[in-house]
Every structure is written in structure tokens, then in C-alpha cells.
Amino acid sequence: GTTGSATGATEEFNTTTSTITGAAWASGGNLNTARGILAGAGTQTAALGFGGYTLPGNSASNATEEYNGTSWSNQNNLGTSRRNLAGAGTQTAGLGFGGHAYRANTEEYDGSSWTAGGDLNTARKSPGGAGTQTAGLGFGGYTPSPPTTGATEEYNGSSWTSSNSMN
């Protein structure tokens, strides 16, 4: 993940360290496009970073980059520029959904390009994301009214289904 606001810095967590200390994190390669509030998917050696905002002006970004454990490489852009979106899945089967301005759209990444997926039932910004491209989970976030939501949805690779809300 990134630290600070729209930095290009990457830090990697060392899972062999049993406690969180300064030695648990190591610097990795910088993003090619410095951004904040971007989404991610994948693992430490096969990650995907996409969307977010760039400075100055907090402009929404459609940039997509892949990380190989050492460096980031630019890839084909998201179809929709946005920040405050969620990510799930892997570097070769990623999922991006939601976003600022209370978006419902979902995009699927196949390792080289993004295509449109099924829309969320509840449009939201800053949702949580987990799972895979064919068994994804979207939860929480901000909606116009009320300001926060506990709504949870499950993605099957083509459409979202409402599930039990968060408590």
C-alpha cells in the first residue's frame, strides 16, 4: 500500500516478523503514477494498483499498474477514472467497483485489460472489497443517504446479489 497523500512510495510487509516493528516493512519500487485513495488486488509479488487521484487538484485517475515484487509497470487503463473504489481478486483476475460520486459500476481485469461487469445494487464510494473475481464481496462505504451503509453484496463473476448487512 501507499503511505502519505498521493505518494509514489511502496512498502512491503515481511510476514516472517511476528510483531509489527520498523523491521517488518521494507521499501519497494515506486508507483509510476503517484496517487492516493487507489484500489489494489493480488499479492506482494503479483499485485495490481488502479484508480485513485493525482495531485494537484485531486483529479480522478484511470491508471493501472502491476507490481512484480520489485517494480511497477503501466498497464491498460480502467474504463472509468475514479477514486475511492474497492479492489478484489488477483493480478490476472482483478475486480474494481464503486467509487467517488457514489458509483455502482464494476470492472473486471484479465491481466491485460478491463471490461465492464455487473453494477452494484447499492452505488457507493469507499466500499470494502474482498474475495475473487468470481466470488467477490463488496461491503460498507458511503451512500448519499444515510451517509454510511452496512450493505453487503456478493459478486458471482457477472452480477451482484444483496447479502446480510454488516452489523
Regions found by a protein language model. Name each.
Residues 1-167:
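Polar, enzyme-active/binding microenvironments
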